[in-house]
Amino acid sequence: MGRGRVQLKRIENKINRQVTFSKRRSGLLKKAHEISVLCDAEVGLIVFSTKGKLFEYANDSCMERILERYERYSFAEKQLVPTDHTSPVSWTLEHRKLKARLEVLQRNQKHYVGEDLESLSMKELQNLEHQLDSALKHIRSRKNQLMHESISVLQKKDRALQEQNNQLSKKVKEREKSAQQISGINSSSLFAHTDFYLGTYQSTNVIDNGKWKEVVLHSSKVQLIIL
């Protein structure tokens, strides 16, 4: 005789119901993983327990991407079949979908900061770890890029300041050189022009600061006469 079909009905005993849920849930997640690997299918599985605890599986570790794809597909199907989008039923379904998606996003956000990890299996924890490692690599890459850009800007500013400093030093040296030349001209402007003798007197014409002057020598005494 063939094996009789077991009638499916709700398990009344809470303990047995919880044990059965845990076993069937593990088997369901395993089957979802198997079909995704064997058939190269994109699988997303969402299960809520009677207490409202969420269990999920996504073969590509991104449930959001699967949900977005499902929404795009559902939207395309709705475009082919005319429906009354203004009906209360349509708005209720849309609200439920958005609420479910919001819950998924909030839960994933908690997972990313290390909260509410008790509900995750080993595989889910490994997937989460992989996501965080990938995110950290992108963060470090962006941080290093910004650091290199900041260093490049500082180096350009440093070169500009050095160039300004060199120009200022050059101008100072040119001014010092000009001042020395002017000082040398002034010191050499006092020179003898003619010498002549008048009896016991000796006179000499000189130029001092652009003015002609006559120096008269009498014995050992020198008299300066300004013309």
From Swiss-Prot:
Record localization: Nucleus
CDD domains: MADS_MEF2_like
An example Gene Ontology molecular-function term: DNA-binding transcription factor activity, RNA polymerase II-specific
BP terms from Gene Ontology: positive regulation of transcription by RNA polymerase II; regulation of transcription by RNA polymerase II
Superkingdom of the organism of origin: Eukaryota
Entry comment describing in which tissues the protein is expressed: Flower specific.
Cellular component terms per the entry's GO annotation: nucleus
Domain MADS-box: 3-57
Keywords recorded for this protein, A-Z: DNA-binding, Nucleus, Transcription, Transcription regulation
A Pfam family it matches: K-box
Nucleus listed as a keyword: yes
Residue span, K-box domain: 88-178
Keyword Nucleus: yes
Primary localisation category: nucleus
Function, as annotated: Probable transcription factor.
Protein name per the record: Agamous-like MADS-box protein AGL8 homolog
